Amino acid sequence: IYLKLQKGKNIKNIKNFFEKKNYTFLKILKANKIPEIKDVVGTNYCFFNIFPDRIKDRIIIISVIDNLIKGAAGQAIQNMNLKYNFKEDEGLNFNPIFP
């Protein structure tokens, strides 16, 4: 994803925002680590990181999900949990599938 930065914002501001929010299934990676699908297979997590673009005031966001879990099925369970006041990760926070 390519995004233009707002005036006065930088990558550090954006990373701090997501780290403070502490979303249940959204994890921002440290340093310059590129997210890999192998890290999210069989989970409901979305791993992402933010990088500077070669064009001034633009950033690149790279994210990965396992579309079998984080896709429609996992999203439906997560939304149901929120609607019925269950823990957001109920039924979704389990060990990943074995190869």
Where are these regions (language model features)?
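C-terminal substrate-binding/catalytic lobe of Rossmann-fold NAD(P)-dependent oxidoreductases
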Residues: 1-62
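NAD(P)-dependent Rossmann-like dehydrogenase/reductase catalytic/cofactor-binding core
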Residues: 47-99
